[in-house]
Amino acid sequence: MSDGQWVCLSSEEFDQLQKYSEYSSKKIKDVLAEFNEGGSLKQYDPHKPISYDVFKLFMRAYLEVDLPQPLSTNLFLAFSQKPRQETPDHPKEGASSSEPNVSDSNAESTAKADAACAPDTESKPIKTQVPSEELEAAAPWGEPNAPASSSDAPIVYLKDVVCYLSLMETGRPQDKLEFMFRLYDSDENELLDQAELDQIVSQMLHVAQYLEWDPTELRPILKEMLQGMDYNKDGFVSLEEWVSGGMTTIPLLVLLGMDDSASKGDGRHAWTLKHFKKPTYCNFCHIMLMGVRKQGLCCIYCKYAVHQRCVSNSIPGCVKTYSKAKRSGEVMQHAWVEGNSSVKCDRCHKSIKCYQSVTARHCVWCRMTFHRKCELSTACDGGELKDHILLPTSIYPVTRDRQAGKSDSGAAAKGELVMQYKIIPSPGTHPLLVLVNPKSGGRQGERILQKFHYLLNPKQVFNLDKGGPTPGLNFFQDTPDFRVLACGGDGTVGWILDCIDKANFTKHPPVAVLPLGTGNDLARCLRWGGGYEGGSLTKILKEIEQSPLVMLDRWYLEVMPREEVENGDQVPYNIMNNYFSIGVDASIAHRFHVMREKHPEKFNSRMKNKLWYFEFGTSETFAATCKKLHDHIELECDGVEVDLSNIFLEGIAILNIPSMYGGTNLWGETKKNRAVIRESRKSVTDPKELKCCVQDLSDQLLEVVGLEGAMEMGQIYTGLKSAGRRLAQCSSVTIRTKKLLPMQVDGEPWMQPPCMIKITHKNQAPMMMGPPQKSSFFSLRRKSRSKD
């Protein structure tokens, strides 16, 4: 191989690149428009090789931030190679002076691009740093009309980079296929030749390797697909042939990101590539799925597993998730899937071996597993999750007249048929609407989404990336006694509560929380913990069945800037569920937020987040950007002004719940012998009375706490100090500011010019409490010591 050997990104770098693309609001199509007249990259020709400097400009326009130097360099090298020598007998750099012109020779250009985008699967991946002088030498390649030269500068073809990045984006597979077709159809004749098709497939194999696919099995599938596309055998593929062939190749659809929203319940499988932790057999050919990486395809709805080569055969359809018509007295039947059930038979209680693929099967709905000879009744009741699950017999389409009255205007404008459903749950059950934010907790949300698709009816599980909470709430609009499970952070919970308010339910559905990511102060107060750590989801669903209800106060946050000041940042929320703060803690949160937006790869764990908070808190201690806060704000509680002149504060927090900064209680605990439950909602500002005031998230009262500085915050966070300074307990708060100050609401910070802020009660939302924490021996000893 020549000097221009493929440079592979490490798995960590690939994950890092994916996180950057998730944070970006731009699409590849948006960035390509920058090469047109009036764009920021108009001086460069996208059809010619580009330099490292132009590559960085392109990536910055796409990701909206600068990539770290090592990642940027390795990604550039992943698409570049030095111009090859004409004579293979001269492998030495710079030995030949006659280098082919990459922009004049179409065949040689294709060969170079093919070499640049074809990974060397036989050789060990190398990680190389591009020397600064070599990158400087590459600059002429990025000039608008720079001719090709014999320089040793690396060459990057923009279309290869664009094709690669488009595969990582979310979107419909058919749109990605059409985009890649037009990207490589440089002569715009609506045809692709064999060399252009090979370049596209090479990029697909490149991305597939990073996703831990086995290219030795995928490559022949893609080659067979290309051969089948050319129906008239003329060596060219039209757009129609390309899209129709791609849409019928299941492994390719999985690679492109199969859209499962349209296949919920119509009998089509939703495939995902999977690495099986235990021996698993193909449900079609009954041969074990082999491989050290991802071994085969598995349906996320029914767990039907097949080889990639077997998926195109006539395999049984997926489970139906609804009934075609309402039938009185209809009994739900088991939906069987054979094999791969290494558990005990639910009748004879004898172990079922994984290789007994034809002698045992399990029901998709109730999870009962039997030997064939042990099967009992064919009726299915939903199993241990029957209180949550919507069986197919509980869902059926409504009449066409009603559907026409409720059809979605957007879909109707496109000529699409929008099917509406009626839900009649089984008596005594409480169907669960699951709303999952796939972006919460890194990739944790995506895994949770797939697990719930299997545990429950896929129709009752919704991806918040696809339309937000509204589609799920509309689906359950007339369903009695349903519950909601919000899977995400505190921001996701607030988003769902806002949409529930707008849905105008006759009865507000109770909401449980499965916390993902970091922080999760509301979930902590509701006893659901600080973050999901991979436990049994079935256990969590069983806990929701027994959950008691508590009412959560929600508050209006009205920010009214002064007319004479310039506009500041946009206020994140106008509803407060957890807390509002101004001053030192908001300053730290704002710096943390800005840094995370710029470098998301540095904030991928809870420990790293805590270290960053410690660093920003330490620097804030010395900077003291919010000192003498009392000179710049006025505080009123229930219309009574609070005197701050004799109190040296750097921050003020308005609390609705007893948790902030990921579990810190700024108000502090109130001793039981002093605790007084207040019947009136008059403002309390007397220090002696405040010692007896109890904090409660459903008392329609706010707690106002003062912070002396970043040092005090650190002491409270680490437990060296019990709480901040209690200033008031009241039912409304008004704050007037006189200068630009950092603020935050429910963990979302912003910079606010002088303004007036009013916080008033909005309503109460029913929330579900988690199970009480089990007391350990050490916690009991601590309690006994505190009593003494």
From Swiss-Prot:
Coiled coil: none
Chain residue ranges for the region called Disordered: 83-150, 768-788
Pathway: Lipid metabolism; glycerolipid metabolism
Residue sites binding Ca(2+) 1 per the record: 185, 187, 189, 196
Origin superkingdom: Eukaryota
Record entry for activity regulation: The activity is calcium-dependent. Requires phosphatidylserine for maximal activity.
Protein keywords: ATP-binding, Calcium, Cytoplasm, Cytoskeleton, Kinase, Lipid metabolism, Membrane, Metal-binding, Nucleotide-binding, Repeat, Transferase, Zinc, Zinc-finger
Cystine crosslinks: none
Subcellular location: Membrane; Cytoplasm, Cytosol; Cytoplasm, Cytoskeleton
GO terms of molecular function: ATP binding; ATP-dependent diacylglycerol kinase activity; calcium ion binding; lipid binding; zinc ion binding
UniProt KW tRNA-binding keyword: no
Keyword Amino-acid biosynthesis included in the entry's annotation: no
Family the UniProt entry places it in: Belongs to the eukaryotic diacylglycerol kinase family.
Protein name (Swiss-Prot/TrEMBL): Diacylglycerol kinase gamma
Species this chain originates from: Rattus norvegicus (Rat)
